Amino acid sequence: MSKIRGLPPEVREPGPGVELGVENGLLCQLIHSPEFNLFSNSVVFESNFIQTHVPEADFQVTKPGNWRDVCEGSATVILGVTSSVPSLPLPNVLLMANVTWPQGPFTTWSTPGDAPVINLSRLLPLKYVELRIYDRLQRILRVRTVTEKIYYLKLHEKHPEIVFQFWVRLVKILQKGLSITTKDPRIKFTHCLVPKMPTNSTETTPENSLLSSPQPSEPLVLLAAEQTSGSFSQLSGKPQLTADRNNDTAIEIDNCSSYKIPSPVASPINLNIPMRAALSHSLWEQEDWNEHLLQVHIASYLGEHFLGA
């Protein structure tokens, strides 16, 4: 029984990233392999580093320029970043792997015994990692995790200087942001690492109406408060009583009939809570304007009856 084989993979010329050793490297092949199958549609930016240490010290560095390799022999550390979703404009995942090269770094192998051994040691969200440039001259990065674990990683000497400049640019991008556009516009998504600036749009949708609904301004709120306080001040004076009890009753009925409860719909205050308030405050912290106005009108109506009695 013959097996149907698929088409051979497309042969492409290696890009400049592959030649520099920052794309399609061992870390990318590891997480895209069937064993892990992680972020298969995302690009991985990676480089080889040497973890540094200072002799006769508990810390990895004490004085500038006094470094020692932590890993013995030809062991190296691969540091890389990628995106959990290909459409994200910035990477959001940090990867670290320990590599042992039997024949030395960047060497080719023809037999499985000469292949490098790679173990994925860290897979962390970038928002829980602090990445800094510690020493530009010696090309050293400082990586601090949320558990206060600090790594001092020196870029391998096999990498040219341009590779470290890529890491310098990456650190600046992660700190300040780069773009609000996506990598692939065909992929639809509802979240973005970089906040999108508001744009003037004439189209109104249910979501846009919530986002564009203005928040009640302070002058309008003060005006409503003055009108409410004025109605309370009018209720403080009792109607003059006459000798005839029937006339008193008629006066009170006329006062009640002349007072009308304003409709909340006719109020100039916009009662829609904007989406910004919903994002910055929890539901129980938001003030319900409908309930507030209704309580004021009921209190005014009851106060008029009690004060006029």
Curated annotation (Swiss-Prot):
RAB2B effector protein required for accurate acrosome formation and normal male fertility. Its main location: Golgi. Signal peptide: none annotated. Keywords: Golgi apparatus, Phosphoprotein. It is found in: Golgi apparatus. GO terms for biological process: acrosome assembly. InterPro entries: GARIL-like_Rab2B-bd. The modification Phosphoserine is found at S231, S263, S267. The gene is GARIN1A. This is Golgi-associated RAB2 interactor protein 1A. Belongs to the GARIN family. GO terms for cellular component: Golgi apparatus. PANTHER family: GOLGI-ASSOCIATED RAB2 INTERACTOR PROTEIN 1A (PTHR22574:SF10), PTHR22574. The keyword Phosphoprotein applies.
